């Protein structure tokens, strides 16, 4: 008999089954107000194109994100449109160009919602995707184009699709 190891991120997710045969994304408006999505979309679009890091932090805080002092979200970073209030970015962390931070995921027969916690002094390379429910520990480094589908321990050096521990000469080379 095979034993499955549950990814700790799954314990932090709220899972809701789709009520009928339609895919869960069709029902998005039942999970979040369309007016909230319009407001968040406008502010996220403005933040994605702003060159000012201080202005970006302010805009992201306006939509409910917790953004630490001196956290730097690069050009085109996209936080979750529906639930940005579930995202926390620690002080002095860097999130690279065109990274997507998701606090929700719609699947065929269910949707999942969960917090994303990025610790202090974290470096996330360009074009990464962070899935809902993950925790990235203080001082961790994530290489570009990585899929973060599980927790990253403090100080870890990870990368890939999905993320895995990297040896020192693999990171950011």
Spell out what each predicted region is.
Residues 66-67, 71-166:
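Structural signal for interior beta-strand "rungs" in well-ordered beta-sheet cores
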Residues 1-65, 139, 161-173:
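Terminal amphipathic alpha-helical/low-complexity segments used for targeting or macromolecular assembly
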């Amino acid at each position: 008999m095979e034993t499955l190891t549950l990814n700790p991120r799954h314990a932090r997710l709220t899972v809701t089954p789709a009520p009928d045969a339609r895919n869960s994304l069709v029902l998005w408006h039942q999970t979040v107000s369309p007016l909230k999505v319009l407001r968040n979309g406008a502010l996220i679009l403005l933040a994605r194109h702003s060159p000012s890091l201080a202005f970006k932090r302010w805009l992201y805080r306006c939509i409910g994100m917790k953004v630490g002092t001196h956290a730097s979200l690069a050009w085109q970073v996209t936080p979750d449109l529906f639930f940005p209030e579930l995202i926390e970015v620690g002080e002095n962390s860097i999130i690279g160009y065109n990274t997507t931070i998701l606090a929700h995921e719609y699947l065929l027969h269910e949707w999942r919602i969960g917090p994303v916690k990025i610790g202090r002094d974290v470096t996330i390379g360009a074009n990464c995707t962070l899935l809902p429910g993950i925790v990235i520990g203080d001082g961790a480094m994530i290489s570009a184009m990585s899929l973060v589908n599980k927790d990253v321990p403090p100080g870890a050096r990870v990368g890939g699709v999905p993320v895995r521990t990297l040896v020192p000469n693999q990171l950011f080379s």
